[in-house]
């Protein structure tokens, strides 16, 4: 489980102090609901530089394949646009705000399995290569190492 920011706000418009307070708020809520905290975040709007500058302390999991499902695209359009993008170690961005996303995720997972891919959690993806997620570091994908933007 990862955070997606306490308010889903644009980190460029939130004070550094408020950004640094987010992990405690998020983890307090997560612990009360599921019993565990998180170590990482997927920053809304992809604006991770503000989070790094504020030294919030999370590892930031971004994406290497964007489905643009939030635009309300059909499953067939999303699949036709994303099929040619996939490589080992990719992280796929999808949202739960559109009705078509669950079906698209199912169709995509089935297609990926047919192509020989194995779907992994973020922890599994990085652990397979022995990568330890570092605080205030951004990760986009992982295959035989890792692509990052450091502190």
Q: Where does each model-flagged region fall?
A:
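Structured C-terminal subdomain patch of bacterial secreted/periplasmic proteins
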Residues: 137-151
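Catalytic domains of cell-wall/extracellular-matrix polysaccharide-remodeling enzymes
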Residues: 2-140
């Amino acid at each position: 489980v990862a955070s997606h920011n306490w308010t889903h706000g644009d980190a460029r418009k939130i004070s550094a102090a408020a950004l640094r307070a987010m992990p405690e708020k998020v983890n307090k809520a997560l612990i009360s609901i599921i019993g565990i905290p998180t170590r990482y975040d997927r920053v809304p709007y992809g604006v991770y530089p503000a989070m790094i500058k504020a030294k919030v302390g999370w590892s930031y999991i971004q994406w290497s394949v964007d489905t643009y499902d939030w635009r309300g695209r059909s499953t067939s359009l999303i699949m036709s646009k994303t099929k040619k993008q996939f490589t080992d170690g990719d992280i796929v961005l999808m949202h739960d705000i559109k009705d078509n996303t669950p079906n698209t995720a199912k169709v995509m997972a089935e297609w990926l399995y047919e192509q020989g891919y194995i779907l992994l959690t973020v922890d599994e993806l990085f652990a397979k290569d022995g990568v330890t997620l570092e605080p205030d570091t951004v990760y986009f994908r992982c295959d035989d190492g890792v692509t990052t933007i450091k502190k």
